[in-house]
UniProtKB/Swiss-Prot annotation:
<comment type="function">
    <text>Involved in chemotaxis. Part of a chemotaxis signal transduction system that modulates chemotaxis in response to various stimuli. Catalyzes the demethylation of specific methylglutamate residues introduced into the chemoreceptors (methyl-accepting chemotaxis proteins or MCP) by CheR. Also mediates the irreversible deamidation of specific glutamine residues to glutamic acid.</text>
</comment>
<protein>
    <recommendedName>
        <fullName>Protein-glutamate methylesterase/protein-glutamine glutaminase 2</fullName>
        <ecNumber>3.1.1.61</ecNumber>
        <ecNumber>3.5.1.44</ecNumber>
    </recommendedName>
</protein>
<feature type="active site">
    <location>
        <position position="285"/>
    </location>
</feature>
<dbReference type="GO" id="GO:0008984">
    <property type="term" value="F:protein-glutamate methylesterase activity"/>
</dbReference>
<feature type="modified residue" description="4-aspartylphosphate">
    <location>
        <position position="62"/>
    </location>
</feature>
<dbReference type="GO" id="GO:0000156">
    <property type="term" value="F:phosphorelay response regulator activity"/>
</dbReference>
<keyword id="KW-0378">Hydrolase</keyword>
<feature type="domain" description="Response regulatory">
    <location>
        <begin position="11"/>
        <end position="126"/>
    </location>
</feature>
<comment type="similarity">
    <text>Belongs to the CheB family.</text>
</comment>
<dbReference type="InterPro" id="IPR001789">
    <property type="entry name" value="Sig_transdc_resp-reg_receiver"/>
</dbReference>
<dbReference type="Pfam" id="PF00072">
    <property type="entry name" value="Response_reg"/>
</dbReference>
<dbReference type="GO" id="GO:0050568">
    <property type="term" value="F:protein-glutamine glutaminase activity"/>
</dbReference>
<dbReference type="GO" id="GO:0005737">
    <property type="term" value="C:cytoplasm"/>
</dbReference>
<dbReference type="InterPro" id="IPR008248">
    <property type="entry name" value="CheB-like"/>
</dbReference>
<dbReference type="InterPro" id="IPR000673">
    <property type="entry name" value="Sig_transdc_resp-reg_Me-estase"/>
</dbReference>
<feature type="active site">
    <location>
        <position position="166"/>
    </location>
</feature>
<dbReference type="InterPro" id="IPR011006">
    <property type="entry name" value="CheY-like_superfamily"/>
</dbReference>
Amino acid sequence: MSLAGGDRPIRVLVADDSELFRELLARVVAAEPGFEVAAVAADGDAAAAMARALRPDVVTMDLHMPDADGYSGIARIMAETPTPILVLTANPTEAAGFRALSLGALDILEKPSATADLGEYGRLIRSRLRLLAGVKVIRHLRGLRERRDAAPARAARVEVVVIGASLGGPRALAAVLRGLPPDFPAPIAVVQHIADGFTAGLAGWLAQESRLDVREARHGDPLRAGRVLIAPSGRHLVLGEGVARLSDAPPVDTFRPSVTPLFTSAARQYGRRCCGVLLTGMGRDGAEGLRVIKDAGGPTLAQDEATSAVFGMARAAVELGAVDRVLPVDEIPRALRELTR
């Protein structure tokens, strides 16, 4: 049973301008004990008002609604009653959908097609809602400052940066990449846990948000200074000498792409010339890989708890002794600029 606390079910607010879809989603959500649809809303303003009045555990939000769209609804909810928000979109390749994540929504999922198996889709969306209902939402990325460990003595200039992120990652990635100059002297490779089909849209949005060359990785892509390669859905991203490689190897820690293969391949190829970064996310993916980078002599960074949507992956790495410095997300770009000089 999926409970938000004690014996209370997870209460979901559904926001969508289509009455038909609202009814369908309400049935799908409530099909399993432990979930309850607290209310439905037809636009962003109504969703914000209901969130303030009803205090649901999680909100599902359509983006394109008349009068007040999903973007304004998300902005109001995050300002007035911060609540975990799952964005539902009909177009996973649309970069504009990721604007919702920059406003504070935590996750994004494609709406079911007309031919979708609603039983399977129901299991998927309920698993996301269950996950999000347990997240303590922050109003802004900038938060209380956590103590930072002193930077280790640097023996070599960093020539490649690898980054791993999960829940809340798109917003954190945007904050990091926005802080880097267009002539950043190292390539960057990223694994972001996200629903299948969304990585191309994520790359497009990050390209708009930053001054870097951000693209979805292809097998054999050269690693170039100022280029950011995002692992595509369903394939591991690993680094060869000067090139990106995609792999269909089995999932690692249930993930494909997984952060750990990226980090371990970077450590193997670049050793102390590689910097590993773990951002916000749930679970342990990437923690062991970050320790491999540290053991190879490369510097390692982690996003702090105050600015993380979920301090899980980074916490696991800290507990392993794999992290040199724990930083607020808006201080990570400066650290990367210093390490690549």
